[in-house]
Amino acid sequence: MMQQQMKTKEDSVKCLKDFENLYANDKSETIFTNLATLYGNLGMKEKQAQFISERLAQDPNCFTAWAVKGQAEMNDSKWDEAIADLKKANEIKPNALVLTWLGYCNNNKAANTQDANQQKALLTETQAYLEKAKELDPDQKEANWRYLLYNTYYNLYGADDSRTKAMDPNNK
């Protein structure tokens, strides 16, 4: 794809213009996702946020817009915002990758809290997300949920728990 050919700033600008022109004629979710991601990758965070907001104004139930918005917030370590937006995407359409991102955000939020009860609650919520991701994508073709689920089981139940052992990446 065009993005794979970007090696210089000029390549990036050309690719961006090409995607903007494509999007002007084709508002498909694929083009939207590529353009929104490209804005983020090029450090154009404000443009990315505006672009996503415009899409959500047109279609408040756009799974892709909520997922891309949540991913951008996750990449910026904005855990609460990412969790809220990824939950919206998941409500619209349950998706293994979105559920895995939710688990990742919750794990990071748990790691940054000193309150053991809050950590346990976050990890329990993470467990539910990742188990649903496992159910939707047992072969991990969409999302690599296994290690996160292993880590979650390990933190909740310890190394000797059968769930932890079953997810241990060394025991494939």
Regions found by a protein language model. Give the residues of each.
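Short coil/turn linking the two alpha-helices of tandem helical-hairpin repeats
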Residues: 3-9, 41-43, 75-77, 103, ...
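Single-residue signature of alpha-solenoid repeat helices
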Residues: 12-15, 48, 82, 119, ...
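Hydrophobic/aromatic packing residues within the alpha-helices of TPR/SEL1-like helical repeat arrays
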Residues: 16-19, 52, 79, 86, ...
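Short coil turns that delineate tetratricopeptide repeat
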Residues: 24-27, 60, 93-94, 138-140
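Helix-start (N-cap) detector for alpha-helical repeat units in TPR-like alpha-solenoids
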Residues: 29-30, 63-64, 96-98, 141-143
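Terminal, low-structured helical/coil segments at or just beyond the last alpha-helical repeat
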Residues: 124, 132-172
